[in-house]
Amino acid sequence: MQQLYDFYILHQCKYKENSLLVSIFTREFGKISGLIRVNKKTINLYQPLVKLRGQISLAKKSDGLSKIYNVEFVESFYQNTYINLLSLQYMNELIYLLLSYSHEEEFLFEKYGFILKNINEINYKYLLRMFELELLDSLGQGVYVDCDIDGMLIDESLSYSILATGFKKNLSTIPNSIAGKNLLKINQSVSLWTDEDLKAISKVTRAYIDYALAGKQLRSRKLLIDYLNLGKK
């Protein structure tokens, strides 16, 4: 019997009359583009934020389409709050835009599943930062805070500027600089982050994600920011 794979739909659109062109996220192969045959009864099954399981026949060519079939429903993670839904859409959009095809992504896949199950209005900012850090690691652009760009250990008593290649020690106070004590928290569990740590780490992941995007725009990020700004008025 052929192996069944768990996966999530990142993006889908209609392809001919009875098929969907999909981008899916898997543990074993990372991101895959493929085709799923559908009918009127099953078409609503293939939506983002739903965990599915099925057989996958990988494309023989790098630019080809895989075939996904014998798909079954596992679990739905549709959230009952708008902020949670936007947060999950943000994760999907990041994976869709940034993740390479056909690379095993066990750690990122497990983090993604954990966040789908546990995100709420209280912890969503923390979990999104955790996801961004894991995604950057998967992209080979991880945030390393052991040393600055000059090879010196990060000092919790100093402040640093964020560069594309790391962190540079500031000789004087500079706007948007990051305290060394907050940078060092990146290596610690999210449960140990303070609100101050979160704000600092958010600046770091924003800078690194923007660098990885190379000018690509995130629709979900804009919606998320606009929604949060409405709450401040």
Curated annotation (Swiss-Prot):
Keywords: DNA damage, DNA recombination, DNA repair
Keyword Coiled coil found: no
InterPro entries: DNA_rep/recomb_RecO_N, NA-bd_OB-fold, RecO, RecO_C
One biological process term in Gene Ontology: DNA recombination
GO cellular component entries: bacterial nucleoid
SUPFAM superfamilies assigned to the protein according to its UniProt record, in alphabetical order: Nucleic acid-binding proteins (SSF50249)
Highest taxon above the source species: Bacteria
PANTHER family (alphabetical): DNA REPAIR PROTEIN RECO
Summary of the function given for this chain in its UniProt record: Involved in DNA repair and RecF pathway recombination.
Entries under NCBIfam families matching the protein: reco
Family of the protein in this entry: Belongs to the RecO family.
Protein name (Swiss-Prot/TrEMBL): DNA repair protein RecO
Organism (species): Francisella philomiragia subsp. philomiragia (strain ATCC 25017 / CCUG 19701 / FSC 153 / O#319-036)
